[in-house]
UniProtKB/Swiss-Prot annotation:
It is found in: Cell membrane. GO terms for molecular function: ATP binding; ATP hydrolysis activity; metal ion binding; P-type potassium transmembrane transporter activity; P-type sodium transporter activity. It catalyses: Na(+)(in) + ATP + H2O = Na(+)(out) + ADP + phosphate + H(+); K(+)(in) + ATP + H2O = K(+)(out) + ADP + phosphate + H(+). The active site is at 369 (4-aspartylphosphate intermediate). It comes from Saccharomyces cerevisiae (strain ATCC 204508 / S288c). This is Sodium/potassium exporting P-type ATPase 1. The gene is ENA1. The chain crosses the membrane at residues 64-84, 91-111, 283-303, 313-333, 816-836, 849-869, 886-906, 944-964, 992-1012, 1022-1042. Signal peptide: none annotated. Induction: By sodium ions. Induction at low salt concentrations (0.3 M) is mediated by the high-osmolarity glycerol (HOG)-MAP kinase pathway, a system activated by non-specific osmotic stress, and by the protein kinase A pathway. At high salt concentrations (0.8 M) is mediated by the protein phosphatase calcineurin, which is specifically activated by sodium ions. It is a multi-pass membrane protein. Keywords: ATP-binding, Cell membrane, Ion transport, Magnesium, Membrane, Metal-binding, Nucleotide-binding, Potassium, Potassium transport, Sodium, Sodium transport, Translocase, Transmembrane, Transmembrane helix, Transport. Disulfide bonds: none annotated. InterPro entries: ATPase_P-typ_cation-transptr_C, ATPase_P-typ_cation-transptr_N, ATPase_P-typ_cyto_dom_N, ATPase_P-typ_P_site, ATPase_P-typ_TM_dom_sf, ATPase_P-typ_transduc_dom_A_sf, HAD-like_sf, HAD_sf. The lineage of its organism: Eukaryota, Fungi, Dikarya, Ascomycota, Saccharomycotina. Present with 688 molecules/cell in log phase SD medium.
């Protein structure tokens, strides 16, 4: 057992298995290549090494959760108030405060518990099985039970459960894009052994296979060498865990300075002022500010009594302190965000961290991957060039698998290069090529045999299948995306694979169509072509070919396709100038073809070449035929070049519209992709990330707009900061490039989001202000590092998230304004109330502590929730992002808070004094802050009037802040009827409507129910005072409307003096205008790339 432990310790530290042979690796790790581990050894290693996971489920620490909820400055004020109340034996006030604390903490606990469970469920979205050899027998086990030393078997479609030193490989390729970012499969070879002195990167260790990689071809056997956090992917996951960095030492500073800095960081983290999103930090700072204001006001109360503090003075101090704390804010904020997160699920956005949804409202820049996010992740044929025949173009095809969609046109005789350089403009484009083909309505000088030969090759040098699913009535396809694109075009031209080979397809929709290109299946049960042999695509030669026998003309045919350079190297001839005779392929001819390859590539297309050759039965004997069908070099020699196809991954239908809306919202979109420059540039121009026909740009701007990863990484930080514009497109982008891009954005004070799906994207996802992972193709590690997960991997869903984030920010701003204005009103009202002295010279509070809490917690809480549910404003996505540094506390909000607070204070004070001195005798009695006595009648009745006034003013304020500038009676100026508009305004948000109605009605039972009114709320039933309450509530409403009218006049004047701030004119402005050096419009922007 001790020896085993030593081996395991050595294995954990050893990272050079690529330098060992399979036998040496097996001996080092202590396993058998044929028998695998014994059951006893497996049990021991599982106990020693642990399960093969990237970390346990997040443990639910209830104590820590409670502490996290309590460590809030607002809750601290409530706690202190509760303790003082109980110490003074004011059980009612203490009990009410305890209830408020319990509600806040409970709701926070529930939400944090849900977030923890969500994280755990995301970790367990995929838990694949593993196939291993133990005790000489093959077993299927859960991948978490894999341990170092297991012999693992993997095949096509499997996810590799751990890092492996390969023993055997058979045509074995893996997709390591989640780890390395490289999209192309990597061919593995178990027989390779690398030198110990060589510096071999992870991606180049071709005798190893890595955890979480997908097997895309072949099968293999390997020794498990690393599991869990010791695997390559585990190392990335471990780096993401990190530490808080709160306590650190700077060698250049003294011990005292370091202690002070660390104390500030820890205190800030404890109070939430230096961690979290901008809103979280702002609210935490607000809570701290309100805490000290509450303490200050309590001191003022005690000072007014010359610090002669008894029970009544202490209770008054508590009352004033409570008036400054928006006790329901945490509850309302949590519920609003929870509702927003629930809404986003229906819009394909899963919110892992609630605060991140609000943070999206401040996003200035979005950095997105291309494949599968901006694009469909599927391939479409776009252009085909057949020498001496012409260029075929396929357009308006949205469904990559549907051959019945799209328009096919032909430019006769012109090549893509000739067409792009043609200055006459008239090239004789023939629309509806397929219909013309059937009707034989084509120019006589066009040789259809050339098209027939190319299409036959495209169909047969292909193993993909395209069919219509009868159950769903949808077109589907199986095979490689590139081959599917070619097969879809062949099917579009009524020459699918099974039409030539006779393979049965119950789902073939074109079985009744008569092909104009082939007379296949003339005899029942016969097939024109019989498959003889195939040489599959190989990443080394980058081509594939198939050998068929043509039963109709008794010829053997070899059809090949692949990368242009690979195919052209196998060709010795092509069809000559007359398009009929085969002529030798000269260097000049190859250069002509290559120009067309570049022309297609510059349009962002992936280019493949096609070639074929044929010979009769009489031209070869059996030995020669056997050599051709078994020897790739022989079969793929002396081919005849037939043509090119350009295919591409089309943008999603929603992408261009989403990009346009982002630009309209003042958000820049950057494409960071591993694809080639030409492809990235073309897609970016197609969806609007890059300009096309708008303005003329300086060369400096052009060079900055599009870069390769190596160009960007080659710049120093100073050079990046000096760029006139950060790149809108970075091609051949590495994970480190993405991190550098985020750092550059942060240095420019930008608030950015990053999308990603691979493990290698995790550092950039975590560094971005908002990390967005892909739900379908994303790795578990990337989801763990993200704040938001897109369940459909669709770029347009980010628009949904940003819109919801802005809506929430708007609504949070509204209810924060409502709640804080009430706090200001109550605090000013109570401070002014210090002037009311009873017969003993003690201050009489014009509102009791329970009245204060009732208004803050009960009356205001539900309208605030209603404000949180307000629909998005019509111009929401026409505004620029809000300043993340300022957040929701703009100068307008701050001024509004004090303005409404002062108007409300005036209304309530007028109601109290009018009741006390107008309707009643004006007697202030004695000991009226405690138990009721006969001398307190006037005070108790006046409190009721003031309580009703403040309650109703708070409710009216909720309606007023629905729009911060428009009149409550003209919320929707586009409505013709004022009456209809009024009812639309109050009924549009039914939750808000009924919560306000509830608040209005609730004032009556609170005033009239015996015991509750005089024992708890310290007020009495009233009569004529209701008239005062109603009158001064209306006065507040009029005051609020007059204030908003003044605001509208002010901002109208500001727009007149500063038209650039007008939203409507900004919407008409070109999003790239800031980069323009002239106003010459409709100038083609030719963005060149430095080589």
């Amino acid at each position: 057992m001790g020896e085993g432990t030593t081996k395991e310790n050595n294995n954990a530290e050893f990272n050079a298995y690529h330098t060992l042979t399979a036998e040496e690796a097996a001996e080092f790790i202590g396993t058998s290549l044929t028998e695998g581990l014994t059951q006893d050894e497996f049990v021991h290693r599982l106990k020693t090494v642990g399960e093969n996971t990237l970390g346990d489920d997040t443990k639910i620490d209830y104590k820590a959760m409670v502490l996290h909820q309590v460590c809030n400055a607002m809750i601290m004020v409530l706690l202190i108030s509760m303790i003082i109340s109980f110490a003074m034996h004011d059980w009612i006030t203490g009990g009410v405060i305890s209830f408020v604390i319990a509600v806040n903490v409970l709701i926070g606990l529930v939400q944090e518990y849900k977030a923890t469970k969500t994280m755990n469920s995301l970790k367990n979205l995929s838990s694949p099985n593993a196939h291993v050899i133990r005790n000489g027998k093959s077993e299927t086990i859960n991948s978490k039970d894999v341990v170092p030393g297991d012999i693992c078997l993997v095949k096509v479609g499997d996810t590799i459960p751990a890092d492996l030193r390969l023993i055997e490989t058979k045509n074995f390729d893996t997709d390591e894009s989640l780890l390395t970012g490289e999209s192309l499969p990597v061919s593995k070879d178990a027989n390779l052994v690398f030198g110990k002195e060589e510096e071999t990167s992870v991606g180049d260790r071709l005798n190893l296979a890595f955890s979480s990689s997908a097997v895309v071809k072949g099968r293999a056997k390997g020794i498990v060498i690393k599991t869990a956090l010791n695997s390559e992917i585990g190392k990335i996951a471990k780096s993401l865990q990190g530490d808080s960095g709160l306590i650190s030492r700077d060698p250049s500073k003294s011990w005292l300075q370091n202690t002070w800095i660390s104390t500030k960081k820890v205190t800030g983290a404890f109070l939430g002022t230096n961690v979290g999103t901008p809103l979280h930090r702002k609210l935490s700072k607000l809570a701290v500010l309100l805490f000290w204001i509450a303490v200050l006001f309590a001191i003022i109360v005690m000072a007014s009594q010359k610090f002669d503090v008894d029970k009544r003075v202490a209770i008054y101090a508590i009352c004033v302190a409570l008036s400054m704390i928006p006790s329901s804010l945490v509850v309302v904020l949590t519920i609003t965000m929870s509702v927003g997160a629930a809404v986003m699920v229906s819009r394909n956005v899963i919110v892992r961290k609630l605060d991140s949804l609000e943070a999206l409202g401040a996003v200035n820049d979005i950095c997105s991957d291309k494949t599968g996010t901006l694009t469909q992740g599927k391939m479409l044929a776009r252009q085909i060039w057949i020498p001496r025949f012409g260029t075929i173009t396929i357009s308006n095809s949205d469904d990559p698998f549907n051959p019945n969609e799209g328009n096919v046109s032909l430019i006769p005789r012109f090549s893509p290069y000739e067409y792009s350089h043609n200055e006459d403009g008239d090239v004789g484009i023939l629309q509806n090529f397929k219909d013309r083909l059937y009707e034989k309505d084509l120019p006589e000088d066009i040789d259809m045999d050339l098209f027939q030969k190319w299409l036959e090759t495209a169909t047969l040098a292909n193993i993909a299948t395209v069919f219509k699913d009868d159950a769903t009535d949808c077109w589907k396809a199986h095979g490689d995306p590139t081959e599917i694109a070619i097969q879809v075009f062949a099917t579009k031209m009524d020459l699918p694979h099974n039409a030539l080979t006779g393979e049965k397809s119950t789902n073939q929709s074109n079985e009744n169509d008569q092909s104009s290109l082939s007379q296949h299946n003339e005899k029942p049960g016969s097939a024109q072509f019989e498959h003889i042999a195939e040489f599959p695509f190989d990443s080394t030669v980058k081509r594939m070919s198939s050998v068929y026998y043509n039963n109709h003309n008794e010829t053997y045919n070899i059809y090949g396709k692949g990368a242009f350079e690979s195919i052209i190297s196998c060709c010795s001839s092509w069809y000559g100038k007359d398009g009929v005779k085969i002529t030798p392929l000269t260097d000049c001819d190859v250069e002509t073809i290559r120009k067309n390859v570049y022309s297609l590539s510059n349009e962002g297309l992936r280019v493949l070449g096609f070639a074929s050759k044929s010979f009769t039965k009489d031209q070869v004997n059996d030995d020669q035929l056997k050599n051709i069908t078994s020897n790739r070099a022989t079969a793929e020699s002396d081919l005849v070049f037939l043509g090119l196809i350009g295919i591409y991954d089309p943008p999603r239908n929603e992408t261009a519209g989403a990009v346009k809306k982002f630009h309209q919202a003042g958000i820049n979109v950057h494409m960071l992709t591993g694809d080639f420059v030409g492809t990235a540039k073309a897609i970016a121009q197609e969806v609007g990330i890059l300009p096309t026909n708008l303005y003329h740009y300086s060369q400096e701007i052009v060079d900055s707009m599009v870069m390769t990863g190596s160009q960007f990484d080659g710049l120093s930080e100073e050079e990046v900061d000096d760029l006139p514009v950060l790149p809108l497109v970075i091609a051949r982008c590495s994970p480190q490039t993405k991190v550098r891009m985020i750092e550059a954005l942060h240095r420019r004070k930008k608030f950015c989001t990053m999308t990603g799906d691979g493990v290698n994207d995790s550092p950039s996802l975590k560094m971005a202000n908002v990390g967005i992972a892909m739900g379908i193709n994303g790795s578990d590690v990337s989801k763990e590092a993200s704040d938001i997960v897109l369940s459909d991997d669709n770029f347009a869903s980010i628009l949904n998230a940003v819109e919801e984030g802005r809506r929430m920010t708007d609504n949070i701003q509204k209810f924060v304004l409502q709640l804080l204005a009430e706090n200001v009103a109550q605090a000013l009202y109570l401070i002014i109330g210090l002037v009311f002295r009873d017969e003993n010279g003690k201050s009489v509070f014009p509102l009791s502590p329970v009245e204060v809490l009732w208004i803050i917690v009960v009356t205001s809480c539900f309208p605030a929730m209603g404000l949180g549910l307000e629909k998005a404003a019509p111009d929401l996505m026409d505004r620029p992002p809000h300043d993340s540094e300022v957040g929701i506390f703009t100068w307008e909000v701050i001024i509004d808070t004090f303005a409404y607070g002062i108007i409300m204070t005036g209304s309530c004070m007028a109601s109290f004094t009018g009741s006390l001195y107008g309707i009643n005798s004006g007697r202030l009695g004695h000991d009226c802050d405690g138990t009721y006595n006969s001398s307190c009648r006037d005070v108790y009745r006046s409190r009721s009037a003031a309580f009703a006034t403040m309650t109703w003013c708070a409710l009216i304020l909720a309606w007023e802040v629905v729009d911060m500038r428009r009149s409550f009676f003209r919320m929707h100026p586009d409505t013709d009827s004022p009456v209809k508009e009024f009812f639309r305004s109050i009924w549009g948000n039914q939750f808000l409507f009924w919560s306000i109605i509830f608040g209005f009605v609730s004032a009556f039972p609170v005033v009239y129910i015996p015991v509750i009114n005089d024992k708890v709320f310290l007020h009495k039933p009233i009569g004529a005072e209701w008239g005062l309450a109603i009158a001064f509530t209306i006065a507040f409403w009029i005051g609020a409307e007059l204030y908003k009218c003044g605001k509208r006049r002010y901002f109208k004047t500001q727009r007149a003096h500063n038209p650039e701030n007008d939203l409507e004119s900004n919407n008409k402005r070109d999003p790239f205008e800031a980069y323009s050096t002239s106003t010459t419009i409709h100038t083609e922007v030719n963005i060149g790339i430095k080589q």
